[in-house]
Structure formats: C-alpha cells, structure tokens
Amino acid sequence: MMKQKNPSRVRICIFFVLFVGSICRASLVSDLESFKEEVQSSLNAMQEKGFFPGATLGIVLKDGTELAFASGWSDVEKKIPMIPAGRMFAGSAGKTFVAAVAMQLVQEGKLDLDKKVSEYLGQESWFSRLPNHKDLTIRMIMTHTGGLPRYVFKENFTKRLNESPDKVWEPEELLAFVFDDPPAHSAGQGWSYSDTDYIVLGIILEKITGTDFYSELERRILKPFALEHTSPSNTRKLKGLVTGYTGDRTPPFNLPGKVPVDGIYPVNPQFEWCGGGLITTSLDMARWSKILYEGKAFSKDQLDEMLQPMDFRSGQPGDQGYGLGVMVFKRPFGLIYGHGGMFPGYETQMSYFPKWGVAVTIQVNADSLSGKLKGSLNGFIGRLVPILEKYFAE
C-alpha cells in the first residue's frame, strides 16, 4: 500500500522546483543579453576603428538560438545604416554548398571520390586540354590538390568579362582560359586553391543528376533547410544586395570602386557559378554552417570524410588544412570548421566551433582591394573567441 504524502511537503517541493527553474531561466536570459551586448560592442568597436564600412554578423548557439547583428553603413556616402538582413555575395564560401551536394551523391552511391575525373568527363572533346587531366580524381578537385590553375584572375578572362558584362558563361568557356596551361603542381603532390576545380565539379554534378546545379541545390539544400535568404547570384540585378566597396578600376577586375551602380552590378556575377555563386545573409550562412558541420545534410561517415584536411602546403593529410570543401583550423581552444569567400566589394567568413556547438558568420561590404577593409575576417572572428569562451566554455 502506498504511503500517503504530506500535502504541505508536496507544495513546498513544487514551489522549490518552480523557484529554481525561474532563477535558471532568468540567469540564461541575463547571460544571453550580456553576450549580445558584448558581441555588438566588439563589432561596433571594429567598425569605429575603420576596419570595415559595414558588417553583419550571424550567430547560432548550441541550442539553436539565432542572433543577428549589424554595424556601420550599408552605403557610406548616403549614410544608410547596415541592417542584419542585408544580403551580400558569399564568394567562395558558396563552395560549401557544392561540396554538400557532392557528398549527398557520394552517400547515394552516384559519385566516387577516388574515381578519376576522366571516368565522368573523359568523352568531352575539351577534356584532354585540362592540365593533369589523366591523373585528376574527384577527391583532388574537391581538396584543391589536383594542380588546376585558376581561371578567374587571368587577364584575358577579366578583360572579356568587362567587355561583355551581360554575358552568360558556359562552364566549358570558363575552363577554356586554362586549357593547355602548365599545372600548378603534379596531381596530388601539392595544394593550390583554384575555383577551376569547382567548375569541373559542377559539370560532373550536373551530368550525374541530369539537372542544372541551382535546381538541384534548391531541391536538396535550400528548400529542405529553409535557407530562404540564400539564392543564386546569376544576374546583374540582385534583390537586397547592399552597397559594396572594391578597388576603383583596380586589377584584376577593373570595376568601379562602389558597386552595384544604379542597382546593377557592373558585370554578370553568374561566371562564379560553382566556385561560389550565391547571395546570402550572415545569419543564413551561420544556419548553414551549423546544419553542415553537425551532420544534418548527410551521414556521419560522409561528414567525417569531408572534415579530413589536406595540408595547405604539401597537399598531404594533416591535422589542419583543406578538406572536401571545408577549411579546418587547429587552435589552442579547439578546431574551427568553415570557409572564407570574396567577391568584388564583399567578403564572408563562416566558422563553426565544434567545442561549443556555435556557428558564426561575418560579412562585410568591402574587399581587400578597396583599402576600406583593414585586417582579415579570420582576425575579426578571432576577436569574438574570448567572448565565446567566457559564455560557453564548460
């Protein structure tokens, strides 16, 4: 027979639980508000010291709490403040999406990382003109260890880009700028970052899926994960694009110092395609970072494979370097996964801290050519690390 409980003691226990719970909730709210204040102060301090014209910052905490910040100016001359929802080019950080689609295809058994690229593209009439074409593997092009030169900084490419600002580029036209060039190094025997790698990868992905890459990205990633502020940067007029600052007629791109001009970007950004190819917000990129590096986009086996880095110098396996569309950095406090990106007028750095389960992305509306960006975005992220440690270290 169950012993009857004392009603007074039960009421006291319930009161105690509710009281402690309310204290904990109040503490969490207080800590969160303090955290937000410190982050905003740090961002404002960098802007006031002239590190960048304007910036947005997106943070997703371990429990999924989303925070969005902004500082400085969307347009300096017109005194238009930056807002958290301001959209900017992701630059090469867009490669993380391309790599994710590739890893989903690996999981489905439709793509083999260690197969030679020739098995997918060898029948193409132009294929034999690619440097190292006989030895390239899928893994090599995804880790930038295949030695393919970069097309994007070639003088003849940037000249044609400016001469034909509305041109829609076919992937093979982009590759043609490196046809018959000497490789950066022997296949698998070095590391050299190259957007050309991801143009080749994009062609392969379209061949496997039978659809254009952006449709596949929408179906597999953007729609399922509700990344509503991320879309292709494949036209000169892009909704929500904030003003960006680049070098005024500075090589290699020779664009106006302030872009877009009357709402129209000076050249068609479509050329970037699978080398980046997206416009987004810092919060969407922070969301994506958390989704990707916490294994929600594909299986743990594929994620483990993605996160195996190749040394930035030797191109051989190391404890930090470049994985399959991801940069892996080893720091005293732990690892960082992520990717940087630049497109004329804009820079992006997405970072995920597995130790704390926190994703951080910063975007600024200036690039290194502009003279208005002082320091690296990795450095800006580094300034936030002590704040993250203060609030989230266990």
How should each PLM-predicted stretch be described?
Residues S368-E394:
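Short, gly/Ser/Thr-rich active-site loops of penicillin-recognizing serine hydrolases
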Residues C13-S22:
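Bacterial N-terminal signal peptides
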Residues K3-C13:
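Bacterial N-terminal signal peptides that target proteins for export
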Residues W73-D75, S128-G340:
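Short, surface-exposed loop or secondary-structure junction motifs
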Residues L32-M88, G334:
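Short, conserved catalytic-motif segment at the N-terminal edge
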Residues E48-G54, K78-M140, H185-T196, W273-G276, ...:
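Short active-site loop at a secondary-structure junction
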Residues H339, T348-S370:
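Short, well-ordered beta-strand elements
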Residues C24-A26:
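Boundary at the C-terminal end of the N-terminal hydrophobic targeting segment
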